[in-house]
Amino acid sequence: QKDSLKIRSIFFLVGNMADKYSLIPTNEQDPFHSIILNNHIKETEDARLPGKSRIGMALDSLYKSGVNAPKPQSIRDIEVVTGDFLIKNVEAAFTIWQRSKKLTKCSFDDFCEYILPYRIENEPLSDWREQAYHKYSCLLDSIDDPIELAKAVIRVSGLKYNDGMNKYPFLPTFSELDHLHWGSCKHLATY
């Protein structure tokens, strides 16, 4: 039974892969990406306010200096996702689903729609699920309520809203956000 559900999960992912892709910087030296990755910018609590984010000011200065907004490279999942990546993702998704049954009684269809996907939007492919599980699985043992679990993840993560991150032209990966501790509303929602 479980193996047949896993096989159906693989078919679900492959069947929905045609329009999935990553948008990544065209080169590793992209100045917009470098600002985020190097993160030597120290923010204050005011970063949540428009015009107060130092990251936002740094990104603005790039735009004003004539640096063209980056044209991201599109990489189609169908061309790069491997069988091993899918199997690893399905196994990890099933672990979460089985472990979190106490949180929500979701059907297999809901599992496929909300738990199984290996990406949120067009962020670079990553092992975000494994990283998140490693960091937050201990919370699954102690918190039964999904809303309280979400609040605990936010508290433990240390992530904060940063208005300037709205100007960042790429979607950060889980590990990039975990390193930054700052993100736009969209970034925080996908974290």
What is the role of each PLM region?
Residues 3-26, 30-179:
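Secondary-structure boundary elements
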Residues 153, 178-191:
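Cysteine-centered nucleophilic/redox motifs
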